[in-house]
Each structure stands twice: as C-alpha cells, then as structure tokens.
Amino acid sequence: ELLCEATKLSGDSTYWKVATSHADATLKNHFREDGSCYHVIDYNPNTGEVLHKHTAQGYAHESVWARGQAWAIYGFTVCYRYTKDKKYLDQAVRTLNMMLRHPNMPNDLVPYWDLNAPNIPNEPRDVSTAACIASALYEMDKYLPENGYHALADRIMTSLSSPAYLAELGKNGCWLLMHSVGSIPHGAEIDVPLNYADYYFLEALNRR
C-alpha cells in the first residue's frame, strides 16, 4: 500500500513495480493448494530460487498460523484496490474461504492463534486476526457485494464488541481489545492487547 501510494504521489513507477513484483512472488510461492499460506519464504538472493518455507510464529511450518492468513486476505485485497487485477482478489477469497471452512474455526469467528495448534479448544484466541479479517471484509464487500461479506464482518465485529474481547473503559492498559497473540513459539505477547489489533478494529469500524 505504501509503495503504491508512493508512485501515485511521486509519479515514479519504480515503487509500483517493486510492489507488484513482491505481490506476484508472494502469490506464486507462499500459498498451499488449500489456500493457506506460509509465514516466511527464504530466497537465494542471487537466483531467486526458493530455499525454505517457514511458519515462524505458528505452531508448525505446515500449520495454519491465523494472523498470517488474515494478512494475506487483507494484503491481497489492497493489491486489488490499486491494480484491479482479479488474481489478487481471487487469492484473498481463497484464503478467506479456507479459514471459514476450517474445522477449528470457532463459531464466534475469533480464531485460535493457529488453527492447527494441538490443544484446541484450550488454545489462546488471537483477536488481532479477527479484527484484520473484519476490516478486509468490509473492503471486499465493495468488490463482491453478492458474497455477503458485510454481514460476515458485522458478525466478527459483534463478537469483538462483546465483553469476552472488548475491555472495560479505562482498563486493559487503555487498549480497546483483549486477548491477542504475538508469537507463542517465541514466548512473546501471549494473551495481551496489541496495538495493531486496535488499529484494525478501529479501521473496521470506520469502514463499516
């Protein structure tokens, strides 16, 4: 988004080319057949060959790390906004559908931090994932109004606005949302408020 805006503001197409090249490489190499994505791809800096595929902040390299999926949905929706290239929106839809159909997706649509984590339902939820998806859905609804994405986003926002996730005024360190997860494998930011969870929540409210 920043690179595309840089081209719009400066008239220099270099930023646009970098953005679309990165998006296309991600589209080609990050996704599995079911629409889920890896977190990190290591490339040979000289040849561009894929060396390793990782999920650094998820349960396992082949697991469905929830926030990574949310960023894929959100990010490729943004790519479509700027380029109007349908392949980006199609990927956002594929990843969204994978999440919605996953047997471990909770009924309130606030995902576990990793949908393949071993102790579900006794695993932490990640509110930042839900907020990010909700914000993306409100934008996706503009492009695919027949898919009911606005209503789906409303369902997520209703969950996030409930006492289970929305903090009481003046509590939770003055953050809005509780129960986000940074990186369980690294023992960092587990079941805490996160600034980007609040960001996506406020953005979703604004888009609504």
Regions found by a protein language model. Name each.
Residues 1-208:
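Glycan-recognition and catalytic cores of secretory/periplasmic carbohydrate-active enzymes
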